[in-house]
Amino acid sequence: MRTHFCGLINETLIGHTVTLAGWTDVARNLGGVCFIDLRDHEGIVQITVDSRAIDQNNSELFRVASGLSYEDVLQVEGVVHARHAVNDKIKTGKVEVIATKIKILNKAAPLPFHAHENPGEDIRLKYRYLDLRRPEMQRMQRTRIKLVQALRRHLDMHGFQDIETPILTKATPEGARDFLVPARMHPGEFYALPQSPQLFKQILMVAGFDRYYQIARCFRDEALRADRQLEFTQLDMEFAFVSERDVQDFVEEMIRRVFKEVAGIELDTTFPRMTWKEAMRRFGSDKPDMRINLELIDVAALVADSTFTPFTNAVAHPNGRVAALRIPRGAVLSRKQIDEYAAYTAKYGATGLAYAKLAPTGEITSPIAKFFSEDAFAALLSHIGAEKGDIVFFGAGNYNKVSDFMGALRLKAGKDFALITADWRPLWVTDFPMFEWDEEAQRYVALHHPFTAPAAINDIDELRTHARTALSRGYDMVLNGNEIGGGSIRIHRPEMQRAVFELLGITEDEARAKFGFLLDALNYGAPPHGGIAFGIDRIAALIAGTESIRDVIPFPKTTGAQCLMTDAPSPISEEQLSEIHVITKKLTP
């Protein structure tokens, strides 16, 4: 139906007859001349129909051209000419096609929005097929496609094997709710959609495949937000006989190469490394945005002699923290704006936010200054590095809570005061705690997942004794404040895996029921192994320059977990429910 793509017509084709096919991007009738911008996936070219240059037998051509509407689907035959008025805004702007034939392949109904408009997200998602025609959406989808292609090429070149793992699998606790699928042939039993291929890729290492990868679809029934979907895509990888550094060095090279190939982005030759403990202390986050040159400063020693109760209580508590955050030029904040910052940090657990403003004149305004001697308060501000025109915020309380809300404040201040530099700052975060203590459940939970190996502990009794302080062999790759990949060295000894299950409150019977197949596999000569999984959606969004992963997913769900285009989820007939042995009941509000 076509000989060339619209966006690839250029000066080398002048004088040649071409056949094109695409959509009517714009159609303009200027009296005796019609100009049509014809669009396909490669771009736009101008089609010209001049009634004055057409003999009487071809007057039908002008009639067709003058009656075109947005998004009509056309086949056009014509001759390539040099344009009199060059359009430097498009790559075909030096040429045009003088049409000799136009065939309407399909008329478009009146549009809910035009391809060059940017309507509300609900409308975009309802008419996703129109939304995806927009040049910006085409660009973002192509970025994703190029990313996946580049990753595959790199892994294939290095001997990795692309192996599929099951979509219908067993429900296992991995941190989020499972999506369950009734098993028609086994009444009362259910499959689960995989939250990740974690256990299968470990079993592939036991099976001797050594280097595995998969572009894997994963499913988690959890609350949605801009960077989270019910179904998402991972680059899943696993290696046998590796250390943490082996995995990290390989994927560093891969990410550097792929970012340069896909988007021309140059990343650091070596990614810096930081322990989880240091990241939380300095930045209040296990995925710090290193583009923001602000750090939390511990000031417990300098406030211990004050009479400000929130500070002294935190200092006295073994798990307390008093941290300060200096914001350059922040003294411009009004009292109302400071209150808004306090309300913002309250969402992250803050019960109050103290501050000190240093006016350009040197005058200090602070509601907590009265709880210090003049010299002590001056020494505190000097230690923090506060200068004229700055504001300093203080947080006090439980160490983890203070880290969380002061870390959130750091990010907000970075955005509000334009302190985020326009570069790319990758980082490895390592040495995560093996476990967290869940006060509500009164038990340990795994910080990464239950299959992560402990660091520097080979003895089970030692792990039991030091569970609260044990570190894991987990690692995350962080880029500009986004965790783009997470992995670990796995447990490969069955007795250690049983001990970890026990510490997590998983009984032996429960472990057999849920993970018996893994424990059995580890019994038969499992090699040391480890790996990592990268979030394709998140990386594509970063490269494409969008804050929402919905923009790089062709058919995403809304934050209400719906597909507005297909109207999913939708009711199922009683007949279908009966076939899968499911009975539903209405819940009273």
Swiss-Prot record:
GO biological process: aspartyl-tRNA aminoacylation
Residues the record lists as binding L-aspartate: E174, R220, H448, R490
InterPro entries: Aa-tRNA-synt_II, aa-tRNA-synth_II, aa-tRNA-synth_II/BPL/LPL, Asp-tRNA-ligase_1, Asp-tRNA-ligase_1_N, Asp/Asn-tRNA-synth_IIb, AspRS_core, GAD-like_sf
Catalytic activity reported: tRNA(Asp) + L-aspartate + ATP = L-aspartyl-tRNA(Asp) + AMP + diphosphate
Binding site for ATP: R220, D221, E222, Q229, E483, G535, I536, D537, R538
Coiled coil (residue ranges): none
Keyword hit for RNA-binding: no
The entry's keywords: Aminoacyl-tRNA synthetase, ATP-binding, Cytoplasm, Ligase, Nucleotide-binding, Protein biosynthesis
Location of this chain's protein in the cell: Cytoplasm
One protein family per Pfam: GAD
Documented EC number(s): 6.1.1.12
Annotated stretches, region: Aspartate: 198-201
UniProt keyword annotation of Nucleotide-binding present: yes
GO cellular component: cytoplasm
GO molecular function: aspartate-tRNA ligase activity; ATP binding; nucleic acid binding
Uppermost EC category: ligase
Record function comment: Catalyzes the attachment of L-aspartate to tRNA(Asp) in a two-step reaction: L-aspartate is first activated by ATP to form Asp-AMP and then transferred to the acceptor end of tRNA(Asp).
Subunit structure: Homodimer.
Similarity remark: Belongs to the class-II aminoacyl-tRNA synthetase family. Type 1 subfamily.
NCBIfam families on file: aspS_bact (TIGR00459), PRK00476.1 (NF001750)
Protein name (database record): Aspartate--tRNA ligase
